[in-house]
């Protein structure tokens, strides 16, 4: 997501002296970045440390502004308050349409100098560029490509069930029934709207990337109101029967811990969940299995953490470009994403340092990018503006919690999206 650079205040006189005299290279000792983000879980914090250390090695100090909440909603609330008060952070982790909203307001800086010099356009996938650029100019530095259509399975529980990874809906249900028979919670889930929507993302994608695109990216009323969408809601109702009684409000990383500890069989979550497994000392293929949600093989729904750079005074621009360059360097892209659990935001980063899940993520992204099936995630702000996303959230969560039938959910979905456009 996105962060901005700011020279630390040294006192009015000292700052004036630096601004007047110090060229780019000599300003580094006094550079500071205040970073607003929501990377607060163990795995995420470890990944963030990679970025902190990388910037510190370049003479850029770090002022942390963590705001808990995996979907970033709370962080955006804090950001709006800061900007309204005329005190925007220098760097902000952002997703998709949130970036575009700030760009439309003329609030973001210009990274064209470094992007052009380093050839970002050739190595960053086009679907990411749609958000990292505005009006033809680079405004954000993509850090990674997270994909949301993953399953994280406890290996011991899977082995007890026969060891076969499910490849379709019927096999998934059979596996969940087996987990229930084993006496563990079949699905580890946190009852928060963005988590409900993350599952729905994968369920809808399992009906094919063309249907997903029509429904969630094109917002086609026929697709949104179709019998296929009703089937998707029916499947959500079925999956709801496999969560535990205490799921409401649970944070996503606590759901990951249930799978890690063998208390649950599977979690449907983006690949940031892998960071939790690694933090707990677990190994892919030995302790847990990573696989695409059944029926979504060959397609990837993504979100991308980006650092959006807000407009700063001219003397601070070099520091901003230094940070952007550091984020996009292949060495950093590899080191950071190995820890974060995501794929690099560049397609030319070697997979050498990545584990089996990381190698699969990189290969899947390349395949989807080449096939045109690398699609923005509805649940994570890369398919629709916030108003539409939140309207979908509301319907999905109410249906998942039994407040709407599938038939009524389809009708409400069409109406809610139309009203939010």
Swiss-Prot record:
InterPro entries hit by this protein: Bact_solute-bd_prot1, SBP
- Indicate whether Transport appears among the record's keywords: yes
Q: Where in the cell is it found?
A: Periplasm
- A Pfam family found in this protein is SBP_bac_1
Q: Tell me, what does this protein do in biology?
A: Part of a binding-protein-dependent transport system for a sugar.
Its lineage reads: Bacteria, Pseudomonadati, Pseudomonadota, Alphaproteobacteria, Hyphomicrobiales
Q: What is this protein called?
A: Probable sugar-binding periplasmic protein
Q: Does the keyword DNA repair apply?
A: no
Q: What top-level branch of life does the organism fall under?
A: Bacteria
Q: Which family does it belong to?
A: Belongs to the bacterial solute-binding protein 1 family.
Assigned GO CC terms: periplasmic space
Residues of the signal peptide: 1-27
Additional comment: Immunogenic in cattle.
Task: State the organism named in the record.
Answer: Brucella abortus biovar 1 (strain 9-941)
Alphabetic keyword roster: Periplasm, Signal, Sugar transport, Transport
């Amino acid at each position: 997501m996105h962060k901005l650079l700011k020279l630390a205040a040294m006192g009015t006189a000292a700052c004036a002296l630096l601004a007047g005299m110090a060229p780019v290279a000599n300003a580094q000792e006094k550079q500071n970045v205040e970073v607003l983000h929501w990377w607060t879980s163990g795995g995420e914090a470890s990944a963030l440390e990679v970025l902190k250390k990388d910037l510190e090695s370049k003479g850029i100090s770090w002022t942390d502004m963590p705001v808990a909440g995996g979907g970033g909603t709370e962080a955006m609330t804090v950001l709006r308050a800061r900007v309204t008060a005329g005190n925007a952070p220098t760097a902000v982790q952002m997703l998709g349409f949130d970036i575009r909203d700030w760009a439309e307001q003329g609030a973001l800086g210009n990274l064209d100098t470094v992007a052009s010099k380093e050839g970002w356009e050739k190595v960053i996938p086009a679907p990411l560029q749609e958000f990292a650029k505005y009006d033809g100019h680079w405004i954000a530095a993509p850090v990674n490509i997270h994909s949301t259509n993953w399953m994280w399975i406890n290996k011991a529980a899977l082995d007890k069930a026969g060891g076969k990874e499910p490849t379709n809906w019927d096999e998934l249900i059979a596996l969940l029934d087996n987990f229930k028979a084993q006496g563990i919670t079949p699905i580890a889930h946190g009852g928060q709207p963005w988590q409900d929507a993350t599952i729905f993302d994968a369920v809808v994608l399992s009906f094919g990337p063309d249907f997903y695109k029509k429904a969630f990216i094109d917002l086609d009323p026929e697709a949104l109101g179709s019998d296929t969408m009703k089937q998707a809601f029916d499947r959500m109702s079925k999956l709801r029967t496999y969560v535990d009684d205490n799921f409401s409000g649970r944070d996503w990383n606590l759901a990951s811990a249930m799978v890690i500890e063998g208390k649950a069989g599977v979690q449907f979550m983006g690949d940031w969940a892998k960071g939790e497994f690694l933090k707990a000392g677990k190994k892919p293929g030995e302790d847990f299995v990573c696989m695409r949600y059944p029926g979504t093989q060959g397609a990837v729904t993504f979100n991308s953490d980006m650092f959006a750079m807000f407009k700063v005074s001219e003397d601070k621009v070099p520091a901003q470009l230094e940070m952007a360059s550091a984020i996009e360097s292949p060495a950093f892209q590899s080191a950071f994403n190995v820890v974060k659990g995501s794929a690099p935001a560049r397609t030319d980063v070697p997979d050498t340092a990545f584990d089996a899940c990381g190698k699969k993520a990189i290969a899947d992204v390349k395949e989807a990018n080449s096939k045109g099936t690398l699609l923005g995630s509805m649940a994570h702000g890369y398919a629709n503006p916030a108003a539409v996303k939140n309207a979908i959230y509301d319907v999905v969560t109410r249906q998942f919690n039994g407040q709407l039938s599938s038939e009524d959910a389809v009708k409400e979905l069409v109406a809610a999206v139309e009203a939010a456009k």
